[in-house]
Amino acid sequence: MMKKFLMDKKGAVGIGTLIIFIAMVLVAAVAASVIINTAGNLQHKASAVGQESTKQVASGLQVMRVVGHASNKTQLDKIGAIVTPNVGGEIDLSTSIVTLSDGSAKHSFVYDSTKHKLVDNGSDSLFNETWATGNYFGVLVLQDSDGSASVPDNPTINYGDKVILTLEMDINATTKVSGEVIPEYGSPGIINFRTQSVFIETIVTLQ
């Protein structure tokens, strides 16, 4: 009788050990599944962040030149910034912002699609065009190889394209002006100049 009891007890212990082992295997499997899923999510997020970072670093704008129109000998009334994109991608100008500060106030300008035009005659003065007013800038297309910048609703420039961002802003002589052309993605184009003490000519190069 005692021998049978001991055998039954050993059998019960063996079954208990087997149950614990199976439970441990199941827990390990669940944990492994969670780790694999987490690793996959992290890899996906890392890839997305890497692509976004590459886009931010490689793309962007360059301000090639800034010109101004003098309404008299001591004040500018119009500014034109010639911009081109960096190598790494295209820039939608309709989502870009221009900021300018003269030291006393900072102004922000957004795109006005009604002030978009192709410049097909180099002999015409750019300042004879109807420019955007208020807190808006317009676009004059100088060079556009694929036609992407010639769409008024969302002019998009890519490598090799050149446009002039046009805006009206009164700037006095001997004034330090700084600003940026900020695209939705990528590095901003930098505007930085000081106006001269007297404007001898109507059209002046500022930067």
From Swiss-Prot:
<keyword id="KW-0974">Archaeal flagellum</keyword>
<comment type="similarity">
    <text>Belongs to the archaeal flagellin family.</text>
</comment>
<dbReference type="GO" id="GO:0005198">
    <property type="term" value="F:structural molecule activity"/>
</dbReference>
<protein>
    <recommendedName>
        <fullName>Flagellin B3</fullName>
    </recommendedName>
</protein>
<dbReference type="GO" id="GO:0097589">
    <property type="term" value="C:archaeal-type flagellum"/>
</dbReference>
<dbReference type="GO" id="GO:0097588">
    <property type="term" value="P:archaeal or bacterial-type flagellum-dependent cell motility"/>
</dbReference>
<dbReference type="InterPro" id="IPR002774">
    <property type="entry name" value="Flagellin_arc"/>
</dbReference>
<comment type="function">
    <text>Flagellin is the subunit protein which polymerizes to form the filaments of archaeal flagella.</text>
</comment>
<dbReference type="Pfam" id="PF01917">
    <property type="entry name" value="Arch_flagellin"/>
</dbReference>
<feature type="propeptide">
    <location>
        <begin position="1"/>
        <end position="11"/>
    </location>
</feature>
<dbReference type="InterPro" id="IPR013373">
    <property type="entry name" value="Flagellin/pilin_N_arc"/>
</dbReference>
